């Protein structure tokens, strides 16, 4: 997985955009509970700007983070308290933190879905295994692919988010195309901000495109077992409810 250009161009307003998403929040509590229970140290793979990881460090948990985007890590490092966290710029499938071992490794907000090939998925899981302390836990989440949506070849562009950036409204428009043969969806997001009323900020548009894979339940279990995870729990939401047909996610807790 190369550095996703979308994160290089959108890192500066990533936090503002995703703070406006009501569906986020329960995931941070889920990973915080695991982190506190582990006692640390904790590693987030695909840590981004620190939305989930930074609050763990403020609780006194020893933390480290890995991300492939220099721009996202720059945003992370600007935040108060980030100096206590060891941050590394590396890809999910090839990160190497030497002899460091962690009681909990996690990958939040569907970061695992950025791994487009089976080889990359297995490589990432192998790197996670190599960095787990004895008895350590790996946790991550992906969305549950609803058949009525993945059956669609194309979802036309539609506005799906409005947030405030530097005192002015910014709108996000998203278009999705799917390739069911490869289980990949191409997501194009267009961020639009009008010129400010005083004319000091011109109109702005940023367009980004990235790919996400999707997984079926037993496909995930197979990948985990192939890489040495023998105790795998799966849930359908961040409240640890069982997986049902209409569950929004697959949450994995593996040892």
Regions picked out by a protein language model, each given a short descriptive name:
Residues 95-104:
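A short acidic, Gly/Pro-enriched loop at the edge of an enzyme's catalytic core
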Residues 122-134:
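A short glycine-rich, Lys/Arg-flanked "PGG" loop and its adjoining helix->strand segment in the class I
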């Amino acid at each position: 997985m190369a550095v996703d250009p979308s994160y290089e161009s959108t890192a500066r307003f990533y936090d503002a955009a995703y703070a406006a998403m009501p569906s986020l929040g329960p995931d941070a509590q889920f990973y915080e509970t695991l982190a506190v229970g582990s006692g640390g140290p904790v590693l987030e793979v695909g840590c981004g700007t620190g939305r989930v990881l930074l609050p763990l460090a403020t609780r006194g948990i020893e933390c480290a983070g890995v991300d492939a985007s220099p721009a996202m890590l720059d945003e992370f490092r600007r935040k108060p308290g980030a100096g206590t966290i060891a941050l590394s710029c590396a890809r999910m499938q090839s990160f190497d933190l030497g002899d460091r071992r962690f009681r909990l490794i996690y990958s939040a907000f569907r970061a695992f879905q950025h791994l487009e090939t089976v080889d990359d998925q297995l490589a990432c899981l192998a790197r996670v295994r190599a960095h787990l302390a004895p008895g350590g836990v790996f946790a991550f989440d992906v969305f549950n692919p609803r058949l009525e949506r993945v059956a669609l070849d194309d979802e036309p562009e539609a506005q799906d988010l409005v947030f405030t950036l530097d005192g002015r409204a910014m709108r996000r428009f998203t278009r999705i195309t799917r390739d069911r043969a490869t289980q990949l969806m191409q997501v194009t997001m267009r961020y639009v901000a009008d010129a400010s009323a005083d004319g000091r900020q011109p109109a702005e548009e940023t367009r980004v495109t990235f790919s996400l894979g999707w997984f079926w339940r037993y496909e995930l279990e197979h990948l985990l077992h192939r890489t040495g995870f023998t105790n795998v729990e799966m849930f359908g939401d961040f409240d640890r409810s069982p997986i049902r047909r209409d569950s929004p996610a697959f949450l994995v807790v593996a040892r």
